[in-house]
Amino acid sequence: MIRGWFVGNFEPSVLKSKDVEVGVKEYQKGDYEQKHHHKIATEITAIIRGRVKMNGVEYQKGDIIVIEPNEASDFEALEDTISVVVKMPCVLDDKYLGEAK
C-alpha cells in the first residue's frame, strides 16, 4: 500500500487495474492539500470519520463528494479524518496544482 492506495495501476497493489484506484486515507486535524485538479479522472471521496472542508464547504461522516475532471478542489481536515477515495480511471501523474486552464 502506498499512502493508503491499495487498488490501481501501481505496485504494490492488491488488485491491478487501469479502470479504478482506491485508497483509504487518514488525516490529522489541520492537514491540508493544495487546490488541484485531475484532467482525466473523476474523484469520489466518502467521509468515513471526521470532518473536512473542500472548496469552502464542510463535509462530515457519511458525506460523499464527487469531483469531476478539470474541477479543482482543496482539502482541509477539520478533525482527525478517515476517508475512502476512488478515482476513475486510474491514470498515473494526473494531478495538477491549481485550477484547470
Predicted regions span which residues?
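Short histidine-centered beta-strand/loop micro-motifs
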Residues: S13-K16, E33-K39, N55-V57, F75-A77, ...
